Amino acid sequence: MKKLFIIPALLGAMFLTSCEDFLDVNKSKDSAITTSVDQVLPVATFYASQICYDHAEYGVYMCQALTTGGKSQTGSYPYSQGWEFLGVNRHPMWRRHFYDLGANINKMNEIAEEKGNRNAILIGRTVMLMSTMMTTDAFGAMPLSEVYKSNSPKYDSQAEIYEWMFKEADELLKLYQDPEWVKCPTNLLINQKMDRIYAGDMQKWETFCKALKARLLLRKLPNWKNTPEVCQEIIRVVDDALATWEEPRYYYPGGVTESNCPWGPYAPKINSWESRDNRLDESIPTTFFLHGILGSIDGTYQVSRGYALDPRAAKIMEPRNQISGMLHLESNIGMDINNTIADFPDLLTQSTKTNPWTSNTGYIALMTTEELMFIKAEAQFWGNDINGAYNTTVEATKENMKRYGIEEATLVDHALNQYKRFFEIKLPGAGQFTIADLMQQKYVAMYLQPEQWTDMRRYNYSSSQNGISYAAPGQTPVYVYDVKNVHNGTNALFAKDAANFNKTYSLHRPFNLYEAYWCTPEDYGVNATLSPNAWVNRLNADTETETKYNKKELEKNGYYTTNAAGEKILDYRILKKRLIWAQKNPAVVQCADDNIEWM
């Protein structure tokens, strides 16, 4: 994968000269190309935010929060179409990790080592820890130990990658406590233009590293290593991080191209061919997300009950039709011929400006405060502290509401009643609290965040559709993504009380999936509609580089099968293969079709 080192260096040079003012790179275009730490660091932090967007942009469709008006089985956007991934040309996050981040940060660290800029090395390694976790959680096995040592580096297993990440997190946290590193006399004087996240504040970067360790540890729940000791360690790490926490935000000033937040209306496409611009202007909230999770009320809008049970619904997206309420659509089912995109909510909230993520001058958070709080809540739940898990979930939900400008102390009249009604119906008390309640509220909080799809895969798309349910010992099993308390459609005046929220909506697969991959006998169950193996659990390695330069490693890792003609072809079943943290744990999971072996 030496090519992965040479090519990104050229891309980096092009990038540096294309956004001088934004990234504070002032350099004569006629001078020879040279690189210094203060030039690469702005690029590294920029791409740190960009890879968060890359993963979230795929994930928001894969976890069925958004869809489009189309219904194609195949196309260049398989994650919002029919899941035909093997024909896609490239995955942005693969290239972002190995090219834009890995190559540039490796070069930066080499120079920083020579110059004694140890603070820059710490930042670079922390960013790479984050990026490595995101990338392996999307693709599984991938190059790590030999990544830039040959054109065809070996693929490390996920077990090996996770072992490295845990060691790297612990080593980084020790170095952040070492004065010879954080107070080294030769450290670079880092300002806001070099580091738009923390302006070189090592304590803040250390705190973020603690948060990354908490995210790493969470991968052990609920399947991998679900023990009281792990739960207690997660709680300890989260509490330690929250004590000095400042959300790691990369703010965009607005202007042209990469100066705009990737989720904003400008929809910048970074480096053109290797990226994907956001499609919020042509996307639609799914029935699962808007009607199920957020509790939208179909029919004529009534101010006394609002557009939805969840007050965040009309902040996350902007209602555009009071007569029919907030319209939604099943995933990949296709828009009715009588509808246009203007009939559905504006996901960019261009008039109300109520969604902080979707502004050109918005920000990308490398991790949100709410995520940290929900990590703690999940550890409390599986550690059998149900009261603690409930209380933390309520506080995390309120924290997410604040992000959208919803605070109980500022609400009056119908808005206050709606706020109280939400908690009375969705989170009534610890006695009724389940892991489904927790994860459904985290699902809302992780909208447009990378963890949204990761969470759904950790819980194996648990619903009555695939018969996979979860429960701690002694608890009644629940389907994590079967949403209860869905409005029953009654349109009578004031039909807004708990009695009207009595339906259940189950997560199911998108419509019009690519039949050759997803409509085979192995996709259907006996006691449940779907097999446990009927979902996408990982992405295939980037086809632009890996099938060309590293085919032997792909073969070793199950990417190929032999057809009837004796030819080796890409095997679509790699998409169904679970990652290390999603394997079946009989202690916490039940399956309607227990005789079907999990892939």
Residue ranges, per PLM feature:
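Positively charged n-region of N-terminal signal peptides that target proteins for export
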Residues: 1-4
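Sec-dependent N-terminal signal peptides
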Residues: 6-11
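Membrane-proximal, proline-rich intrinsically disordered regions
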Residues: 19-71, 96, 348-352, 468, ...
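Phosphate/oxyanion-binding loops and surfaces in catalytic or ligand/nucleic-acid-binding neighborhoods
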Residues: 47, 51, 244, 399, ...
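Structured, solvent-exposed acidic/aromatic patches
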Residues: 70-408, 428-435, 595-599
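C-terminal structural cap/anchor segments
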Residues: 385-472
